[in-house]
Amino acid sequence: MVWFKRVKPFIRTTDRRDVPEGLWSKCEDCGAMLHRRQLEENLNTCNECGHHFRISPYRYFSILFDNEEFTEFDDCLRAADPLTFVDTKKYPDRVHDTIEKSGKTEACRNAFGKSAGADLVISAMDFGFIGGSMGSVVGEKISRAADKAIELNAPLIVISQSGGARMMEGAFSLMQMAKTAARLTRLGENRLPFISLMTDPTMGGISASFAMLGDLNISEPKALIGFAGPRVIRDTIKRDLPEGFQRAEFLQEHGFVDMIVHRKELKQRLAKTLAMMRVEG
């Protein structure tokens, strides 16, 4: 007869609960774990260190337009393939796959509406579409946004979030630098303000063209802004770069950025600034 039975020790666990994917996000700067609801309430900024997460054009529209009401325009434009470009896949296939995967149609979206009760036109770039690169469609959309601002007699805000020119379109992409810069001069001729908002990243042909041409150049905190990347520059000149090189704060210190604004204060600061810049009559 067995009086005792040896039982192997074990740890009793509670029933496993599946956590929905995407419920938590980790801050890239401080490592804090942020709940999705908390992140949205803070306009996709970290409440611990102030890090600004990248957001879509629609998110900027909802932040800046009154009651999240706006009208999008020129969403029908699609990229052509003038060079029949092929890298690891054909350019049209890459565009099609990106549209299917992301649900976005291009790296730029245009909208107009009311902000603080006044008419406003916004052209916002999207890093989530082929790195926010500027091809012929992006250049055309920004140009049409300037035309819409003139039509509505309203200020224009261009929100940059891009790695630069779209290499798949070659010279057609580089032409957009001159095209957008030329079109934006018409705003000045019509005495309409143009505000450039640079977010992370604003690089390459974007920083070398319209992003630095604003009547007021604004940036989000710690945004990477420059032409070539810091690693490329370091490898070229064979020297260490200053601390914070190509960050918004460094550029403001050296006179390239007029104002750094936290996303929570963006609408209020823009409203005050545009009110002062508004020309009557």
UniProtKB/Swiss-Prot annotation:
It catalyses: N(6)-carboxybiotinyl-L-lysyl-[protein] + acetyl-CoA = N(6)-biotinyl-L-lysyl-[protein] + malonyl-CoA. Binds 1 zinc ion per subunit. Transmembrane segments: none annotated. Its cofactor is Zn(2+). SUPFAM superfamilies: ClpP/crotonase. Acetyl-CoA carboxylase is a heterohexamer composed of biotin carboxyl carrier protein (AccB), biotin carboxylase (AccC) and two subunits each of ACCase subunit alpha (AccA) and ACCase subunit beta (AccD). Component of the acetyl coenzyme A carboxylase (ACC) complex. Biotin carboxylase (BC) catalyzes the carboxylation of biotin on its carrier protein (BCCP) and then the CO(2) group is transferred by the transcarboxylase to acetyl-CoA to form malonyl-CoA. This is Acetyl-coenzyme A carboxylase carboxyl transferase subunit beta. It comes from Chlorobium luteolum (strain DSM 273 / BCRC 81028 / 2530). The gene is accD.
